[in-house]
Amino acid sequence: MLKILSTQLTGVFQRISTQEEEQFEDAARLLAQAVISNGTIFIYGIDEMEAVAAEALYGAEKLPNVKRLDINEVKTADRVLIVSRFCTNEEAIRIAKQLQEQNIWTIGMSSIIEETTQTLVDYVDVHIDLCLKQPLVPAEDGTRIGFPSAVAALFAYHSLALMTQEIVAEYE
């Protein structure tokens, strides 16, 4: 079962890397703009995606000027990263709408599932699909288990952080 999980997770990482390459570049540019202009990068992780906020705030290779989102502190030079399991998360959509009304550049990170009337994708400037729609490992009873959404989000975050650091280094 461990080998299946490892293989499936590698596939998720590959899909994120190839399908979302343009979105990573756009999102990294937005974050680099905040770093270069002494703005703040605000992070908001919903439920298990709080792992991304923890990594951004306390990880070994933090981006500069990162804070947990306080919507009342956000200014136009700042950028916001909202991370949720699925693009249909109501809390993520509500926050993204507020930020859009304030003309704040916002990046969303979530798995895109069946389109409904509104999704996070509709209210952010750049969206990175986490490409994880169902559990990865088939169980003996025909169901599936193993839904590592936070692992996919951490991979996407680290990819984004590396690209952002590269852009900032080129600027300096």
Each model region followed by its residue ranges:
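Long, low-complexity, intrinsically disordered N-terminal extensions of eukaryotic proteins, enriched
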Residues: L5-T7, E21-F24, N72-V74, N89
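Short, contiguous, pocket-lining structural segments
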Residues: M1, Q23-D26, E48, A152
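Short, surface-exposed alpha-helical recognition segments that flank or form part
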Residues: T18-E22, P148-V151
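Generic N-terminal amphipathic, Lys/Arg-enriched alpha-helix
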Residues: M1-T18
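Short, flexible loop segments at the rims of nucleotide/cofactor-binding pockets, characterized by
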Residues: S17-E21, V83-F86
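Internal, active-site/partner-interface "lid" segment
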Residues: T10-F13, L136, Q165-E172
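A short, well-structured juxtamembrane/interface segment
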Residues: Q19-I36
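Glycine-rich phosphate-binding loops that contact phosphosugars or nucleotide phosphates
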Residues: G39-T40, I46-Q165
